[in-house]
From Swiss-Prot:
Protein name: Indole-3-glycerol phosphate synthase
Keywords, sorted A to Z: Amino-acid biosynthesis, Aromatic amino acid biosynthesis, Decarboxylase, Lyase, Tryptophan biosynthesis
Keyword match Flavoprotein: no
Species this chain originates from: Cyanothece sp. (strain PCC 7425 / ATCC 29141)
GO biological process: L-tryptophan biosynthetic process
InterPro entries, per database record: Aldolase_TIM, Indole-3-glycerol_P_synth, Indole-3-glycerol_P_synth_dom, Indole-3-GlycerolPSynthase_CS, RibuloseP-bd_barrel
This protein's encoding gene: trpC
Coiled coil start-end: none
Reaction(s) the record says it catalyses: 1-(2-carboxyphenylamino)-1-deoxy-D-ribulose 5-phosphate + H(+) = (1S,2R)-1-C-(indol-3-yl)glycerol 3-phosphate + CO2 + H2O
Highest classification ranks of the organism: Bacteria, Bacillati, Cyanobacteriota, Cyanophyceae, Gomontiellales
Length: 302
C-alpha cells in the first residue's frame, strides 16, 4: 500500500494564486483521507502549542511506564491492550454515552495489561484530552493511538502522558520509521510499529531498535478484516521475530475466545481489542462499567 501525501496548497502572491496540480487531488482510500486531513490538523496544532512549549512540558512530565514489560508480565496471555475508542470510520459511533475515564478504569480493574487511547478527533472522535484525563486516572501504560506523520505528534503524546506511540508502516517511509523510532526511544516511549502485509513486515525487520510489531488484521484501505493476516505473516517471519525478541501484537477483528486462541497459537503475545469491549450488547444488563468489562474480558479468556 502506498499512501500519498496531501497535494500542495494554493499559495497567494498579491493578486495571483498558484498551485502545483497533483495528478489526482482526491484521496484514494480512507487511510489516505485521514493522512491528508492529519497534515492540516498538525499545522493547526503547532500554532496553538509550538514544539518548544511541548518540549518543556515533556521535560517536567512524570517518567514513562514500561509498556513492553507490562505486556510480558501480564495477568492474561496473550496480554490485553484494551482500547478506549468511541467511533471508527467503518462502524460509526460505538457508544453514545461515552466516558473515557470510566472505561479506562474498568479495563484496569478487569485485568488489562495496557491501554490504547484514540486521539484522532475527526475520524474516531478521540482526543488528546482523553489521553491526559486517563493518565491522571489509571496506573497502566498508555499507547497513544494516533496517525503519526510528524515528530511533533510524538512530543504531544508524551506531554499528555503516553508511554508508547503507534507508527503505521503504510504511511511512513523507512527513513521516517527509523527516525521516529529514535525519537520514541529518546523520550522513553515504546513504539508499536503496525504492519498489514509481508512487504511492510520485511521493511520493519530491516530497522534497528524494534521491540514491538503490531499486525493489523484490518486492511486500512477498505477496512475489511481477516484474522488469517496475523497467522500468515507470523508463519512466514516467525524465526526472524523470535530471534530478535520482538513482541507481536495482533490487532482488530478479535471478538471471542477462539479468536484469541487462533492468533496466540500463531505466535502473537498480545492482542489489541477495542470495538468488542466498548460496544454494548443489545441485551446488556450491567449497571456498572467495571462489571461489564470484567464479564467481557473473562469471556475472551475463558
Amino acid at each position: 500500500m502506498q499512501i500519498r501525501r496531501r497535494p500542495n496548497p494554493v499559495v497567494a502572491v498579491q493578486e495571483l494564486r498558484f498551485q502545483v496540480k497533483a495528478p489526482d487531488a482526491t484521496p484514494r482510500n480512507i487511510l489516505e483521507e485521514i493522512v491528508w486531513h492529519k497534515e492540516v490538523e498538525v499545522e493547526q496544532m503547532r500554532e496553538r502549542a509550538p514544539l518548544l512549549e511541548l518540549r518543556k512540558q515533556v521535560q517536567t512530565a512524570p517518567p514513562p511506564r514500561d509498556f513492553v514489560a507490562a505486556l510480558r508480565q501480564a495477568q492474561y496471555q496473550p496480554a490485553l491492550i484494551a482500547e478506549v475508542k468511541k467511533a471508527s470510520p467503518s462502524k460509526g459511533v460505538l457508544r453514545e454515552e461515552f466516558d473515557p475515564v470510566a472505561i479506562a478504569q474498568a479495563y484496569a480493574t478487569a485485568g488489562a495489561a495496557c491501554l490504547s487511547v484514540l486521539t484522532d478527533e475527526k475520524f474516531f472522535q478521540g482526543s488528546f484530552t482523553y489521553l491526559n484525563q486517563i493518565r491522571q486516572a489509571v496506573h497502566l501504560p498508555l499507547l497513544c493511538k494516533e496517525f503519526i506523520i510528524y515528530p511533533y505528534q510524538m512530543y504531544l503524546a508524551r506531554s499528555q502522558g503516553a508511554d508508547a506511540v503507534l507508527l503505521i508502516a503504510a504511511i511512513l517511509s523507512d527513513q521516517d520509521l527509523q527516525y521516529f523510532l529514535k525519537i520514541a526511544t529518546s523520550l522513553g516511549m515504546a513504539a508499536l510499529i503496525e504492519v498489514h502485509t509481508l512487504t511492510e513486515l520485511d521493511r520493519v525487520l530491516n530497522l534497528e531498535g524494534v521491540s514491538l510489531v503490531g499486525i493489523n488484521n484490518r486492511n486500512l484501505e477498505n477496512f475489511t478484516v481477516d484474522l488469517q493476516t496475523t497467522c500468515d505473516l507470523l508463519s512466514k517471519r516467525w524465526d526472524q521475530l523470535d530471534q530478535r525478541n520482538i513482541l507481536v501484537v495482533s490487532e482488530s477483528g478479535l471478538y471471542q475466545a477462539v479468536d484469541l486462541q487462533q492468533v496466540q497459537t500463531a505466535g502473537a503475545k498480545a492482542v489489541l481489542i477495542g470495538e468488542s469491549l466498548v460496544k454494548k450488547a443489545a441485551d446488556d444488563r450491567f449497571s456498572h462499567e467495571t462489571d461489564r468489562m470484567q464479564a467481557k474480558i473473562s469471556a475472551l479468556y475463558s
